Amino acid sequence: MQEKPDIPDQVILSCLQTEYGLDCRGVEFLPLGADVNTAVYRAESASGQGYFVKLRRGDFTEITVTLPHFLKSSGIHAIIAPLETSSRRLWAELDSCRVIVYPFIPGRDGYEQALSQAQWREFGRTMKAIHTVALPPALSNAIPRETFPSEWREQVLHFQSLVEEKTFAEPVAAKLAACMQANRQTIHQAVRRAEQLGRLLQTRSRKFVLCHSDIHPGNLHLSPEGAIHIVDWDQPILAPAERDVALIGGCPAWSNPAAANWFFEEYGRAGLDPLALAYYRYERVIWDLAAFCQQILLTDAGGQDREQGYCYFAGNFLPGHEIDLARAVDPFPDS
């Protein structure tokens, strides 16, 4: 969220005191991320201890906090586990929001700072540990399984029809509509290819592993000491491993072949399916297109988040960006 929500700072401070026993002297809104349902803050105690405070409205499931807590307890050090409340819960309630508190670790994300060779190797080892962890039944039964759904593809085609039929007065919506019209053929090709690959993958017997499902540079936090942390476990899923590793080499910030080699030397390439990698790269584009269409075409609200959303949307079509990188790994991109 790029714009601060209409929640007084004192209300957040009172929640931290009441629910977590934290005597914080202030909170600072951090304009981070593209998720319009999540606001994040930095809180600081009187002793100078920092906390990362997430306010989540809308859908919430316990697995988003219980899973990282389990992974951290299992020895996967790249996970930042949420703190417990005074009543030993992993979140608190604040009006219509859930409040989740983490230790604040200074650093930058993978968009702001390139990973070193050592960090790429640690990233590969960490993802291997996540994909091979043994989940207890209580957790595995609570995590959705991949079904290769057509929902997002259908939404993109719906929005494509909408921009062909409707004129948008709001400037950002008008820009997005024009971008969709200019890239009509590219969008339809990506949707068609994802549909073909999804049907094919449904017929194959594939091992499902625990996947983060939203591995991208913005969800990789790099500390000044060089440690890496995988954050934002809002949508875990049991799926083929390609769901997570598709963006290694599949987004502009991570398209350096040498970096991908460092990652896979630790993670391993055995068993990875090029068709599954292509499917998840196409689907990643389609998920983003649908989400930004919802954000921008269905409402005029959102302020600065709208312009940022448009930039993310349009970036998919730039040379060497997400669409091109999906086609690059697809053995039959024009099928």
Give residue spans per PLM region:
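A cross-family kinase active-site recognition segment
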Residues: 113-182, 208
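Phosphate/dinucleotide-binding and metal-coordinating scaffold of catalytic cores
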Residues: 39, 44-49, 57-63, 76-78, ...
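ATP-binding pocket architecture of kinase catalytic cores
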Residues: 46-142
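Active-site acidic catalytic loop and adjacent metal/ATP-binding pocket
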Residues: 36-45, 52-53, 82, 192-245
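All-alpha amphipathic helical-bundle segments outside canonical DNA-binding/catalytic cores
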Residues: 143, 272-281
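A glycine-centered beta->alpha junction motif in the catalytic cores
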Residues: 99-113, 161-173, 286-303
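Active-site activation/catalytic loop segments of kinase-like enzymes and analogous catalytic loops
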Residues: 241-272, 282-300, 310-316, 320, ...
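Regulatory N- and C-terminal appendages and interdomain linkers associated
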Residues: 1-29, 185-186, 192-193, 200, ...
